[in-house]
Design a protein with these regions (language model features):
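Alpha-helical transmembrane segments of integral membrane proteins
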Residues: 356-532
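N-terminal carbohydrate-binding/catalytic regions of secreted carbohydrate-active enzymes
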Residues: 64-137
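Substrate-binding cleft of extracellular glycoside hydrolase catalytic domains
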Residues: 105, 111-187
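Conserved, mostly hydrophobic/aromatic
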Residues: 100, 156, 210, 250-252, ...
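Substrate-binding cleft of secreted/luminal carbohydrate-active enzymes
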Residues: 256, 266-326
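Active-site clefts of carbohydrate-active enzymes
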Residues: 214-222, 242-272, 301
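Aromatic- and acid-rich polysaccharide-binding/catalytic face
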Residues: 124, 154, 192-231, 255-256
């Protein structure tokens, strides 16, 4: 008996179909698929052993602290701080740090008393911006708090990255610093990215010590994790020599645990732990003063900085230890839950495919289910950390639903297509062109975003693997004019996207592979299918 198998032989070749279920081929493919699924998630989530940062009894110097819960933002109107949250936060931080650094005075009136209660010292900061009224209010509160809490406030910071944002001039900032110095007893400083200290040397004489921000991930020329500590050491050495005898404090340094790759700088929990543990060991050995960014993950920062902005914390937004400072650390701590989700997708694929008859279908169906389980699960994990707004959740739901529909179409194509499976297959077959069109549209929109507005966007490559592969292997009839335009947009964006990201960006290459080699090829093959 012979049958055309368009799912596997799109040019219309034929293959034999047996009357018996190919049990051993099916069993082999199922075991291989399950092994691949388990290996994929365990490989991503397995605990990595690193040298601990310090002994459990040794406290670190300082950490940046903002008192926002995971559902809060400083832009909330009206904004209400939660005193019980601040109290619990400081109790937790007091077990690992000697001091905390703040960035604004507004709403933090209770902080000195809480710091005193938990034995913490404070570096308090006034938020300086382009509005002179707001700035004057912040500076007045800074002076008052420093004088009223001299036992816990060890130093004051007049402005944070204000020159970077170009909200005041160097001369205006120096006047503010001198005003504060004349009215407090504590050392006074200003904090900014290290390059801006070099661009504005007139600020150095006004401060008692320099506070520089050293974030290798955000550098114009990002450092990979293996070179990041050397870069920090070199910059610190330059400042120590240039501005001696004034002390230089590293006021912000750290590494993100989630987010998009920048050239060779890859965010991950393991890389964050590598950087923090290595930096602290180096700083303690060199006798540097430092402040780590930051105490807790801040999801609200994702709105302005993309996913990466929300994940610089030593603890997550639920105040759970991320394993950055000590013990084993996992890049995907929820890998076992995603494994369960993947298992359900795998089983669902087998159920849709049913009792296949050909040996080739028996091999392909379980492997298709395993691939879909991995890619859809990885897309879900990416969405968990990147999605910020209702519109973005709608986009996630659209792509997830699209993947499941395409997976169902592919599984039914591999089935014997009898009974309800035949009816479902025919329904999918009539609408397959629109599934391709929606996939192409989503890929084209993503490509345009990654070409024209890439800085804070992650690479959603895993969301397109299943649709691209399915319709590459089995092209279907599509609306020609629309698909031709989408194919051109995606294909034209590959080179500029790679050029912007740099040829060493593995995530960018992953997107180029999925969108270029797979998606463009799939759309092109679909364009060549004539309507029946």
């Amino acid at each position: 008996m012979q049958v055309t198998c368009a799912a596997l032989f799109p040019d219309g070749l034929t293959m034999p179909v047996t009357s018996r279920f190919p049990f051993f081929a099916y069993l082999f493919a199922c075991l291989l698929g399950l092994f691949a699924l388990g290996g994929f998630w365990y490989g991503l989530g397995k605990p990595v052993i690193l040298p601990d940062v310090v002994s459990a009894t040794h406290k670190l110097q300082c950490a940046s602290y903002t008192p926002f819960d995971k559902d809060q933002s400083p832009f909330d109107v009206p904004f209400k701080l939660r005193p019980e949250r601040m109290d619990a936060d400081l109790a937790l931080l007091a077990t690992r740090f000697e001091c905390i650094r703040t960035y604004s005075m507004t709403g933090l009136e209770a902080l000195p008393d809480l710091a005193r209660k938990h034995g913490l010292k404070l570096m308090i900061g006034a938020w300086v911006n382009s509005n002179p009224v707001d700035t004057a209010k912040e500076v007045d509160l800074l002076i008052a708090s420093a004088n009223a809490n001299a036992d816990v406030v060890t130093s004051v910071i007049v402005g944070n990255e204000t020159l970077l944002r170009k909200e005041v001039t160097g001369a205006q900032l120096a006047i503010l610093i001198n005003k504060v110095k004349s009215q407090v007893k504590q050392p006074v400083t200003y904090a900014d990215v290290w390059e801006f200290w070099l661009k504005h040397p007139e600020i150095a004489p006004a401060v008692d010590f320099l506070t520089i921000h050293l974030l290798p991930y955000w550098e114009d020329d990002p450092s990979n994790i293996d070179a990041a500590l050397q870069h920090v050491a070199e910059v610190r050495q330059v400042f120590g020599n240039k501005f001696a005898p004034k002390d230089v404090m590293i006021g912000e340094t750290g590494w993100p645990s989630e987010g998009r790759q920048r050239e060779t700088a890859l965010p991950s929990r393991v890389n964050e732990a590598k950087f923090i543990r290595g930096f602290v060991a180096m700083a303690e050995q060199q006798g540097w003063h430092y402040n780590l960014i930051e105490a807790f993950d801040q999801p609200w920062k994702r709105a302005s900085e993309g996913a990466v902005g929300g994940y610089w914390g030593l603890f997550d937004a639920d105040r759970q230890d991320k394993g950055v400072l000590a013990g084993p650390v996992s890049n995907v701590p929820y890998w076992s839950q995603w494994l369960v989700v993947g298992g359900l997708i795998f089983i669902g694929t087998l159920i849709l495919g049913g009792r296949v008859r050909s040996t080739r279908a028996a091999l392909v169906l379980p492997l298709l289910g395993a691939l879909a389980a991995c890619s859809i699960g990885a897309w879900g994990d990416l969405a968990r950390v990147t999605t910020r707004f209702a519109s973005e959740w709608l986009w996630v739901a659209l792509l997830t639903g699209l993947n499941l529909l395409v997976l169902a179409h592919a599984a039914l194509t591999l089935s014997t297509r009898t009974g309800w499976r035949a009816q479902a297959f025919n329904a999918f077959e009539r609408r397959a062109g629109w599934l391709v069109a929606v996939t192409g549209f989503a890929a084209a929109v993503t490509m345009l975003e990654l070409v024209f507005d890439p800085r804070y966007r992650s690479f959603p490559s895993v969301a397109f693997i299943v649709p691209a592969l399915v319709y590459l292997c089995r092209p279907v009839s599509v609306p020609r004019r629309e698909i031709a335009l989408l194919t051109f947009i995606i294909g034209a964006g590959i080179a500029p996207q790679l050029y912007q990201e740099g040829l060493q960006n593995q995530q960018a290459w992953g997107w180029a592979l999925v969108s270029g080699l797979m998606m463009v090829a799939a759309l092109w093959r679909c364009l060549r299918v004539r309507k029946g």
